[in-house]
Amino acid sequence: MPEIPEPEFSEAGLPKAVRSETASLSWLEDAIPVATRFDDPYFSLKGGLEETRHVFLGGNDLPARLQDGFRIAELGFGTGLNLLTLALAWRPQDPEGAGLLHYTTFEAFPMAVGDMARALRHFPEAAAISAPLLAAMSAGETRFRLPGIAVEIVHGDVRDTLPAWTGRADAWFLDGFSPAKNPEMWGETLMAEVAHHTSKGGTFATYTAAGHVRRALAGAGFEVSRLPGFAGKRHMSAGVLR
């Protein structure tokens, strides 16, 4: 049998097979990346860390629920800021460093490592954790460890990759681009897959309160709540799988 060559990696640190799908960006104030495909920023102009803490941590009752073996899944890895914010929250919960969280994230349009670094340099609070993240990404790794967190990045169309995933999450970060601009990420079929890959009593949180998204999640089995949004945004959504 002929030897299968090792995959080659681009200068951006991504396998060349997904190079053509690398996110195309513009920038606001040289600090906030905007996906040109969807004309949508990757995080709030009023504070990325604070937004993640309010929406994805607060909406999932984290870090209070975090414990060894806890599993988080995410739709939309982007800059990796949600992962870094989680890591910052986990450290005080596990001061001896004995526990391990599991973090699986699904991303169709990976950001080039140089662009990730450009976005994350504006969050010095997370610098100690972003450095090993960027190193792993530069090496083309899709499975690696940060302090206290085992990370798995799944590239490809989530409508294909999520059904093939064998895991279940205790908490979901639903962070795709706006439902109005990226409706494929928020349809009934995909929200049913999210529920299928959620442990009983597991939760989700998302920045959007769009009615059709809430109905899709409720139809999939979640008890959905509408909560105050971040930084003047009227509402966000969170829920529990019953």
Predicted regions and their residues:
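Short SAM/SAH-binding signature in class I
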Residues: V151-I153, G167-G176
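Glycine-rich SAM-binding Motif I of class I
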Residues: G80-L84
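Conserved glycine-centered beta->alpha loop in an early N-terminal alpha/beta scaffold
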Residues: G76
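Conserved beta-strand signature within the Rossmann-like core of class I S-adenosyl-L-methionine
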Residues: K200-T208
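A short glycine-rich, Lys/Arg-flanked "PGG" loop and its adjoining helix->strand segment in the class I
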Residues: M185-K200
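Rossmann-like AdoMet
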Residues: M1-A73, A87-P124
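Class I S-adenosyl-L-methionine
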Residues: A209-R242
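S-adenosyl-L-methionine
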Residues: D115-W165
